[in-house]
Design a protein with these regions (language model features):
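N-terminal export and membrane-targeting signals
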Residues: 1-16
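C-terminal region of N-terminal signal peptides and the immediate post-cleavage residues
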Residues: 7-9, 23-45
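N-terminal signal-anchor transmembrane alpha helix of single-pass membrane proteins
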Residues: 16-24
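Short, intrinsically disordered, charge-biased short linear motifs at domain edges
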Residues: 34-35, 68-73, 151-152
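Exposed, flexible binding/inhibitory loops of compact, secreted disulfide-stabilized domains
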Residues: 43-49, 162, 166
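Generic solvent-exposed, charged/amphipathic alpha-helical segments
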Residues: 52-57, 153, 157
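Extracytoplasmic/periplasmic/luminal assembly and interaction segments
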Residues: 53-100
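Extracytosolic low-complexity repeat regions of secreted or lipid-anchored proteins
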Residues: 93-166
Length: 166
């Protein structure tokens, strides 16, 4: 039996290494990329960075996932999307709820239409806090939206409240 030459061993190692790197690049490219959510107009506000440190790891049993966009947080497959740095709403006749000391306005103009005209998402916005925090919840997650707002309350309360719902 003839031993392989050094050249054959080096060439075989290089080919094998290249194949391994190519397989790794292919596997990485097949991973889902984080959702790109448009940042709020004032997402760079220092209070947004402060509250982000206290976002819960899970909402509605969904893990917090990576998201592109400053001031943006996402749980699950975008079941819940949070954007900090919104312009505070003016006094409104839209439904306003106080959940554990945080006032939230259900923005009727911001809910999006799904198939068949049903509302596929609901958008809530903190009231009386600057910057405001917007939370968008899918229709499937809407039945537990109260739980979501309770879970987000600890983080959001770090933004001082300057006005209350009527």
């Amino acid at each position: 039996m003839v031993a392989p030459s050094k050249k054959a061993l080096v060439t075989g190692g290089a080919v094998g290494g290249t194949a391994l790197v190519a397989a790794g690049v292919l596997a990485f490219s097949l991973l889902p990329s984080p959702p790109e959510i448009e940042s709020a107009p004032n997402a760079g506000h220092p209070l947004c960075a402060d509250i982000a440190r206290n976002y819960p790891r899970q909402l509605l049993g969904e893990n917090r996932t990576e998201a592109k966009g400053e001031g943006v947080a996402v749980w699950g497959d975008s079941a819940v999307v949070l954007r900090c740095g919104m312009k505070p709403p003016k006094p409104t006749t839209d439904l306003c709820l106080n959940v554990n000391g945080v006032d939230w306005v259900l923005r009727s103009d911001a809910s999006s239409e799904g198939e068949g005209g049903s509302k596929s998402k609901k958008t809530l916005l903190t009231y009386g806090r600057d910057p405001a925090v917007e939370v968008t919840v899918t229709a499937e997650a809407m039945t537990a939206a109260g739980d979501t707002l309770v879970d987000l309350g600890d983080a959001v309360r770090a933004i001082p409240q300057k006005a209350k719902c009527i």
